[in-house]
Structure formats: structure tokens, C-alpha cells
UniProtKB/Swiss-Prot annotation:
This is Protein pxr1. Residues 15-25, 256-266 have a biased composition (Polar residues). Keywords: Nucleus, Ribosome biogenesis, rRNA processing. Residues 154-170, 204-238 have a biased composition (Basic and acidic residues). Residues 25-79 form the G-patch domain. Residues 1-11 have a biased composition (Basic residues).
Length: 304
């Protein structure tokens, strides 16, 4: 009921079962029923009816009103504790069994059955629809056989970083053969993609493939597109690395004469990448100028 609903206050009367009306003999209902041949304690309806066999003593009793204070549906029984039974009933049954001449083994077997039934009822109330099933043991699976060749082709081996001695000498080692083979694979993938596009543009091609074949073909196309995208990304990364390596080599060649006087550096500095290399080059030149006595004298205009 919302806030805009009509507010109705209901009160439970002092006679909710309406026994005062049923007991009174002065009312119109009691008088008309007596006029029709009804007497107190009899059933309502014809005595020779087809459902007369279903009448019980409850049919002659009063209709009782039950207050519904829950959200259960009509006819639903409220949840009650199955273990909430009469206490001491098991011991009383055992006593009756001894009086009937049963042995102790029979009594123990019956008691065990009752205990098992009690545990089963408790489990049914505690875990209603849960069934514990053994799932076995976990076994490690071998992924080497299931690895697809497409995932193996996409493996990229980046070239290792050059050491400080190689930077000083201005020598750079070539990339390993894995990257070269990967570039060849990228080129072949591009050629295959170009051939497929040419075949697709041809007229008169029949498109009567089954849904499964078309699905497999779409998956192959997606894998090849991913492979070509990885190849393009690898090419751009290698081009950026080569450009930065050339700039580092030029900067190192300019400062080899100054570094030779101070001796070889023991600590390895991190080489900047990208647009920061130009700023780092100017910072290195300023550091070298401050380390050199002659350049300091020129800065402070001191004549020697």
C-alpha cells in the first residue's frame, strides 16, 4: 500500500470467531434454518447428496476465522521446526518396547533409525536443496598440445638493450634472427591478405557455404587481421628504436673525447626514449661543460 492509498483502520472484534451469532437462537438466520428443517448439530444441505460421505464432525462445527499476519499464499503452511516435537517420546517408545519383550539389540537398531531420520530432517531444514557431490581431484593439464600455431606465430622477440661499452664505441648489434623470421611471416601474411582481396573482388563467386564453414572462415579472417596489426605495430616500434639509437650514437660520438679524460664510467645510465632524448642531450652537454675546467673558465670569463 502506497502513501496515496486510502487509510483504513481495521479492528479485531471481541468475538472474531462469531460464536455469539451462532449461539444465539433469536436471530433471523437461526429461525429461517429451523423453518427449513435444520436442527442444531446437523449438517447443511441434503442428506442424500453425493458428497455426504465426505462429511465429518468438523462439518457440523462452527467456521473459525484465522488472522493472516504473514505474506504466504493461500493454503501455504508456515515454516515450522521439524525437530520441535514432543520431548521424551523416543525414551517412551523404548520403554514400551522393553515391556513388550523386545531385546536390547532390537531397541538399539530402532533408536539408530530414529536418530538417522532426525539427522536427515535437520539436514533438509538446514541445507534445503544442496547436494554434496564429490568433484574428484584437480589434475594439471598440458597446454603444449593445445596451443594453437597462430598464437605461436604471434610471439615477438624484442632485441636486447645494448650495454654501456657498445654505446661508447658507437657499435650496435643487429637484431636476432627470430625478429627477422617474424618479419618474413608478416610479409607472407600481407601477401595472403592481398590475394584474398583479389579473389573476393572476382565476379561469379558462389557463396553457398554452410554456416559452420562461414564461421570458421570469419575466425581465420579475424586472426589474420590481428596478425597484420601486430606486424605493423612491431615495425613502428623497431623504426622508433633505430631512430633513437642513431641519436644516442651521435650524442656519444660528440662526448667521447671528454669522457676519455675522466675515465670509463662504472654506473650505467638509463637511456631516454622518444621526445625526451633531445632534452637529455642538452642536459648532458651542460654537465660535461661544468666538469671541464677550460669550459668553466670560459663561462666565468677567467683568463689563464
Amino acid at each position: 500500500m502506497g502513501l496515496a492509498a486510502p487509510r483504513k483502520k481495521t479492528k479485531i472484534s471481541h468475538d472474531p470467531n462469531n460464536t455469539s451469532w451462532s449461539r444465539s437462537t433469536d436471530g433471523f438466520g437461526h429461525r429461517i434454518l429451523k423453518a427449513q428443517g435444520w436442527t442444531p448439530g446437523d449438517f447443511l444441505g441434503a442428506r442424500n447428496a453425493t458428497h455426504s460421505d465426505l462429511f465429518t464432525t468438523a462439518s457440523a462445527s462452527h467456521i473459525r476465522v484465522v488472522l493472516k499476519d504473514d505474506t504466504l499464499g493461500l493454503g501455504a503452511r508456515p515454516k515450522r521446526d521439524l525437530l520441535d516435537g514432543p520431548t521424551g517420546l523416543d525414551a517412551f517408545k523404548g520403554l514400551l518396547g522393553r515391556l513388550n519383550g523386545k531385546s536390547d539389540t532390537q531397541l538399539e537398531a530402532e533408536q539408530q533409525k530414529r536418530d538417522d531420520a532426525k539427522l536427515a530432517r535437520y539436514a533438509a531444514t538446514k541445507w534445503q536443496t544442496v547436494r554434496f557431490i564429490s568433484g574428484g581431484l584437480l589434475v594439471q593439464e598440458k597446454d603444449n598440445a593445445t596451443a594453437s600455431p597462430a598464437s605461436q606465430d604471434l610471439r615477438v622477440d624484442f632485441p636486447r638493450e645494448t650495454s654501456s661499452n657498445e654505446h661508447e664505441n658507437g657499435m650496435f648489434k643487429t637484431e636476432p634472427m627470430d625478429s627477422y623470421s617474424h618479419q618474413e611471416g608478416c610479409a607472407t601474411a600481407r601477401e595472403e591478405e592481398g590475394k584474398k582481396k583479389k579473389k573476393k573482388n572476382k565476379k561469379g563467386k558462389e557463396m553457398d557455404m554452410s554456416p559452420r564453414k562461414s564461421r570458421e572462415k570469419k575466425q581465420e579472417k579475424i586472426q589474420k587481421k590481428r596478425k597484420i596489426g601486430d606486424c605493423d605495430r612491431l615495425d613502428t616500434e623497431t623504426a622508433d628504436r633505430t631512430s633513437t639509437k642513431v641519436l644516442v650514437a651521435v650524442a656519444n660520438d660528440k662526448g667521447t673525447s671528454l669522457l676519455a679524460s675522466n675515465g670509463p664510467s662504472t654506473s650505467r645510465e638509463r637511456q631516454p626514449m622518444g621526445r625526451r632524448i633531445f632534452r637529455s642531450r642538452h642536459i648532458e652537454q651542460k654537465k660535461r661543460a661544468l666538469m671541464d675546467d677550460k669550459s668553466l673558465n670560459e663561462i666565468f670569463m677567467i683568463k689563464t
